[in-house]
């Protein structure tokens, strides 16, 4: 009996000793692996040059949230700048080498000559149909015209903000806008927009759903239309679809790599959607000069201050992708 108990105790002690030995062996092996891994990291770290993403960046909200950039003063060496101007500027200057002249002047401000791109547009109406902004920073010059003030404001609203858009089938469905950020954006050679608000029984309010002549006309033969109606109410729409495309869009936030520079005019463009708030003028500037050379000289002189108010995080704008995100 005592022999069996002694054997059991001895077996238990041997098991404990073996287990302790195994654990110590595993610990030494793991320490060896970890130390070798750390040694490899220390040796290779001077040869690795990878950016550190996401440590202090917000993971919610707009990706356009401005973040501190420790290399901001060197941004011009690795960035592109697009300059959009009306063709009348080139006509007035009448100099085939004026692009090269401005590129050399930009060089004095720290911008390499190969990073500046000049793009002309005929007029506000034509630019509204097919705006394309591809550079890291985009400066859009608009000469003030009192007869086109509203068109300029709509174009500025389109350019200075990001929009998430989806197609609208106005022949089959009614549509409503859910909040102030929800707008209907139309583009085309000629956009005429008519709307008929509906009650809860889908009957027209002040109009007949079967007679488009009774609809309220909110835009007539325009190139770009941003339509805002009463939120929460269904609407039946009538659009010149053969010459115009309409999309249901949601304003996501600012497109911070775009700035609009108004040339001349006594009034400052305002793209504020809500009439009860202060005017929205972020990245909207004005230059008051009569001659285009003077306008260009002024902008070159202040280009670095203008860019400091911008961010190159935003997506590019291509109206060809209008069905998804602009």
Curated annotation (Swiss-Prot):
Q: Does the keyword Calcium apply?
A: yes
Spell out the subcellular localization from the entry.
Virion; Host endoplasmic reticulum lumen
Q: Where is this region: GPR motif?
A: 253-255
Q: List the carbohydrate attachment sites.
A: 69, 238
> What does its PTM field state?
N-glycosylated.
Q: Where is this region: CNP motif?
A: 165-167
Task: Using the record, list the residue span of the signal peptide; answer none if the entry has no such feature.
Answer: 1-50
- Disulphide connectivity of cysteines: 82-135, 165-249, 191-244, 196-207
Q: Name one GO cellular component term.
A: viral outer capsid
The residues that hold Ca(2+) 1 are 95, 206, 214, 216
List the Pfam families: VP7
Which GO MF term does the entry hold, naming one? metal ion binding
Which keywords accompany this UniProt record?
Answer: Calcium, Capsid protein, Disulfide bond, Glycoprotein, Host endoplasmic reticulum, Host-virus interaction, Metal-binding, Outer capsid protein, Signal, T=13 icosahedral capsid protein, Virion
Instruction: Detail which positions bind Ca(2+) 2.
Output: 177, 228-229, 231, 301
Function noted in UniProt? Calcium-binding protein that interacts with rotavirus cell receptors once the initial attachment by VP4 has been achieved. Rotavirus attachment and entry into the host cell probably involves multiple sequential contacts between the outer capsid proteins VP4 and VP7, and the cell receptors. Following entry into the host cell, low intracellular or intravesicular Ca(2+) concentration probably causes the calcium-stabilized VP7 trimers to dissociate from the virion. This step is probably necessary for the membrane-disrupting entry step and the release of VP4, which is locked onto the virion by VP7.
Q: What else is known?
A: Some rotavirus strains are neuraminidase-sensitive and require sialic acid to attach to the cell surface. Some rotavirus strains are integrin-dependent. Some rotavirus strains depend on ganglioside for their entry into the host cell. Hsp70 also seems to be involved in the entry of some strains.
User: Subunit info?
Assistant: Homotrimer; disulfide-linked. 2 Ca(2+) ions bound at each subunit interface in the trimer hold the trimer together. Interacts with the intermediate capsid protein VP6. Interacts with the outer capsid protein VP5*.
Entry-linked HAMAP family = Rota_VP7 (MF_04130), Rota_VP7_A (MF_04131)
Protein family per UniProt:
Belongs to the rotavirus VP7 family.
Query: What's the protein called, per UniProt?
Result: Outer capsid glycoprotein VP7
Organism, as annotated: Rotavirus A (strain RVA/Human/Japan/MO/1982/G3P1A[8]) (RV-A)
């Amino acid at each position: 009996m005592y022999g069996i108990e002694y054997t059991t105790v001895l077996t238990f002690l041997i098991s404990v000793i073996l287990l302790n030995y195994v654990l110590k062996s595993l610990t030494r092996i793991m320490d060896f692996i970890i130390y070798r891994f750390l040694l490899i990291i220390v040796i290779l770290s001077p040869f690795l040059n990878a950016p550190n993403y996401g440590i202090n960046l917000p993971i919610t909200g707009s990706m356009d949230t401005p973040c501190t950039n420790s290399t901001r003063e060197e941004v011009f060496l690795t960035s592109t700048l697009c300059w959009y101007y009306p063709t009348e500027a080139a006509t007035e200057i009448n100099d085939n080498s004026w692009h090269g002249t401005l590129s050399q002047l930009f060089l004095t401000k720290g911008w390499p000559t190969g990073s500046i791109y000049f793009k002309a547009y005929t007029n506000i109406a034509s630019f509204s149909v097919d705006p394309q902004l591809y550079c890291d920073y985009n400066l859009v010059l608009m000469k003030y015209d009192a007869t086109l003030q509203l068109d300029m404001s709509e174009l500025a609203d389109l350019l200075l903000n990001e929009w998430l858009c989806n197609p609208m089938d106005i022949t089959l469905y009614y549509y409503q806008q859910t909040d102030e950020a929800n707008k209907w954006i139309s583009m085309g050679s000629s956009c005429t927009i008519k709307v008929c608000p509906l009650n809860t029984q889908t009957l027209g309010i002040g109009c007949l759903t079967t007679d488009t002549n009774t609809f309220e006309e909110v835009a007539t033969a325009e190139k770009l239309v941003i339509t805002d109606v009463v939120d929460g109410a269904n609407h039946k729409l009538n659009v010149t679809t053969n010459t115009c495309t309409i999309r249901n869009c949601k304003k996501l936030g600012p497109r911070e790599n775009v700035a609009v520079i108004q040339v001349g005019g006594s009034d400052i463009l305002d793209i504020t959607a809500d009439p009860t708030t202060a005017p929205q003028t972020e990245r909207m500037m004005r230059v008051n000069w009569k001659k285009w050379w003077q306008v260009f000289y002024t902008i070159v002189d202040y280009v670095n201050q203008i860019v400091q108010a911008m961010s190159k995080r935003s997506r590019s704008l291509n109206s060809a992708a209008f069905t998804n995100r602009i």
